[in-house]
Amino acid sequence: PDKRIVILSCMDTRLVELLPKAMNLRNGDVKIVKSAGAIVNHPFGGIMRSLLVAVYALKADEVYIIGHYDCGMSAVDPDVMLDSMLERGITQEIIDIVNYSGTDLREWLRGFGDVTTSILKSVELVRKHPLMPKGIPIHGLIIDPNTGRLDVVRDGNKHL
């Protein structure tokens, strides 16, 4: 890649072409990791591992966490998700086993109320991660999925 950047963005399909255009990126410029809501919700989960791989193995020296307005994760209701799982053949026994194993399934499935708060929470988790090197700017942005306007909610250069 021409730029040593890794981006975590939401998996919303509206961002596939819009985000690179808004950031003036060409194909191959950056590493992109996607998750529902651009959420990093576990310090040792797959999303965090991908960001660390980008930094250590792929030499990224800047991280952007980019959510978007009108995100579907703001409306995710864990009870509706659990009902849908039951309707699609996941048994109550399996759900009980997952809950019993120490995972609060409702909390794990829960969306967020406010995109700004969610992005800032993810930025802080990544910034304070014990394996993230100091001096790596962790930026938080929100994109308007209709216009491509980017709003900076955390300038990582000011919080090194």
Predicted regions and their residues:
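Divalent-metal-activated hydrolytic enzyme cores
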Residues: P1-K3, A38-G45, V53-D61, M73-L160
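Short, conserved "active-site rim" segments that organize catalytic pockets and cofactor/ligand binding
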Residues: P1-M48
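Short beta-strand segments
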Residues: L8-C10, K34, I66-H68, L141-D144
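Short, surface-exposed, charge-dense and proline/glycine-enriched linear segments
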Residues: L19-K31, V63-G67, Q92-G102
